[in-house]
Amino acid sequence: MFHTISYTGSREKQHNQVISQLKSLIYEEPDRIANLANASALLNFYLSDINWVGFYMYDGKELVLGPFQGLPACIRIPLGKGVCGTSAKERRSVRVDDVHAFPGHIACDAASNSEIVIPVIKNGELIGILDIDSPLKSRFDEKDQAFLEQLVQVLTEQL
């Protein structure tokens, strides 16, 4: 069972609290959809100033919408298109301070102004991406990126 907590202490301590919660949520749960759904809900609960958080799964050809929290979203994203497709194709995290200045940005929600995307890779294979949008410009920084990369690594072990 999930218990809400007040995140206290340094930012690093709070990030560690979220990672611990994720580990508890996915422990011995083999279902990929359940784990991705709970990870999305946990991040939506923890992160401030975001308007969308979720996963797109790679089907061998393109990214397909997976579990998420937020408004309805674009269903399919080709590799190399937009922030999500770029992250998936290049298999690297992409942090964008102003999505309107990103070439080829796909606007699923007009309220989004910044975005961070983390690839989900297991055994060298692309599984999908974690996508988080914010209505604020420059919402995500290096510490957010490091935290989210660590969270995705923990999650990937159970996928």
Where are these regions (language model features)?
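Intrinsically disordered, low-complexity terminal regulatory regions
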Residues: 1-66, 159
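A short, aliphatic-rich beta-strand micro-motif
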Residues: 114-121
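Short hydrophobic/aromatic beta-strand element in the GNAT-like acyltransferase core
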Residues: 52, 117, 129
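Juxtadomain coupling helices with adjacent low-complexity linkers
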Residues: 2, 23, 134-159
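Regulatory sensory and allosteric helical modules in signal-transduction proteins
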Residues: 50, 58-108
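A generic structural signal for residues located within well-ordered alpha-helices
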Residues: 31-34, 79, 112, 143
